[in-house]
């Protein structure tokens, strides 16, 4: 069995979808399934390379606009190589991959769509893209969604529910190493404090303003540490100053991957305050679960975030945009930490990378009748 993943980018470029593509490709390869990736690279020329056994066709980008790439070599390369593969596993949203597949000799191929999220922000461009997307949805043999919630509420998928297969994202514990010296340093820096950790790009849909405001309702021995950079940083700093929360909320900026695990390990609870379905899954919750850290997140309509965080098992799910509810949930978890002693077990059974790979291989075998 030979599988070609159509991805937007690929490692060493680091992103959420790219990591999922890598984990599935490498995991399937370890089970004897030949896996390759077609992706846009960040170089001025196209080239091929092997990474951890996965063959990557890296294609030059001619133009980048509204989070999408135009790459003539991507379209040409797919036409050249598609005959070598049994299954085309296309990761969306990615208009370029969709277009390339349309112009390829796809007729005798099995096609799996991996629906990572709807297109939420670029609404005008989406209208132009819709006919091509609908063609692909009709042509696909199966559609993977990362949660039952996303499949249920996505307007784009409503007419194709019979094709949906639910395969949650999984992460690999081997990618997360704790430095005990860093953990000790964090505890010393915030000595006597209950640590609430949060992480993500500082953008509107992440809802960090509500987490900052929640600090007004927290005791003085609580501190919120927010990792990440983004366009909302100045707004958050002004909010912290306005409410005089300098001793309760710290914006840490970018945290290196080598240090991230240590921040999770040092925290008492993790908070994902996202408010829009642009946050389709919330992989960062899995990272907290891995370290047996319970999570407070929001029940976002049409998003899988609240489904991933099982209420009263792995954490507490609250309504979005309510700072007081966030604060109340954070206090409840910290005051009854023993209730969430099995968070890591919940992770291992549901969100370990091996679970994702096994379910994906099962689907591959189903659609080619092995």
PLM regions with names:
Residues 248, 332, 338-353, 359-362, ...:
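A short, well-ordered alpha-helix in the C-terminal region of glycosyltransferases
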Residues 137, 254-255, 262-267:
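Short alpha-helical donor nucleotide-sugar binding micro-motif in glycosyltransferases
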Residues 19, 23, 194-217, 231-237, ...:
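A conserved mid-protein helix/loop that constitutes part of the nucleotide-sugar donor-binding site
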Residues 265-280, 293:
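Acidic donor-binding loop of glycosyltransferase active sites
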Residues 310-323, 330-337:
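Conserved acidic donor-binding segment of nucleotide-sugar-dependent glycosyltransferases
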Residues 138-176:
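A short, active-site helix/loop in glycosyltransferases that binds the activated sugar's phosphate group
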Residues 235-255:
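Nucleotide-activated donor-binding/catalytic signature segment of Leloir-type glycosyltransferases, i.e.
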Residues 290, 294-299:
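Short hydrophobic beta-strand element within catalytic cores of glycosyltransferases
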């Amino acid at each position: 069995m030979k599988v070609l993943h159509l991805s937007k980018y690929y490692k060493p470029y680091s992103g959420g979808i790219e990591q999922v593509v890598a984990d599935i490709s490498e995991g399937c390869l370890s089970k004897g399934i030949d896996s390759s990736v077609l992706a846009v690279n960040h170089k001025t020329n196209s080239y091929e390379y092997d990474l951890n056994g996965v063959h990557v066709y890296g294609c030059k980008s001619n133009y980048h606009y509204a989070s999408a790439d135009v790459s003539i070599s991507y379209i040409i390369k797919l036409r050249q190589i598609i005959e070598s593969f049994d299954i085309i596993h296309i990761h969306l949203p990615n208009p370029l991959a969709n277009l390339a597949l349309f112009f390829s000799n796809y007729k005798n191929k099995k096609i799996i769509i991996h629906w990572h999220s709807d297109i939420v922000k670029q609404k005008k461009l989406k209208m132009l893209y819709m006919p091509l997307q609908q063609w692909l949805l009709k042509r696909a043999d199966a559609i993977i969604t990362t949660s039952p919630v996303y499949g249920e509420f996505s307007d784009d998928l409503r007419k194709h529910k019979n094709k949906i297969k639910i395969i949650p994202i999984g992460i690999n514990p081997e990618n997360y190493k704790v430095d005990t010296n860093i953990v000790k340093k964090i505890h010393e820096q915030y000595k006597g404090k209950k640590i609430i950790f949060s992480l993500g790009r500082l953008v509107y849909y992440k809802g960090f303003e509500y987490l900052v405001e929640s600090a007004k309702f927290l005791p003085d021995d609580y501190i919120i540490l927010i990792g990440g950079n983004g366009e909302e940083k100045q707004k958050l700093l002004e909010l912290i100053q306005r409410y005089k929360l300098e001793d309760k909320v710290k914006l840490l900026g970018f945290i290196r991957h080598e240090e991230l695990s240590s921040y999770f390990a040092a925290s008492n609870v993790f908070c994902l305050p996202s408010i829009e379905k642009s946050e389709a899954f919330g992989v960062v919750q899995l990272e907290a679960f891995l370290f047996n850290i319970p999570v407070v997140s929001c029940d976002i309509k049409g998003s899988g975030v609240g489904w991933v965080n099982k209420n009263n098992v792995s954490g507490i799910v609250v309504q979005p945009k309510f700072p007081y509810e966030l604060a109340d949930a954070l206090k409840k978890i910290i005051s009854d930490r023993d209730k969430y002693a099995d968070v890591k077990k919940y992770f291992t059974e549901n969100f370990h990378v091996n679970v994702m790979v096994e379910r994906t291989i099962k689907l591959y075998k189903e659609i080619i009748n092995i």
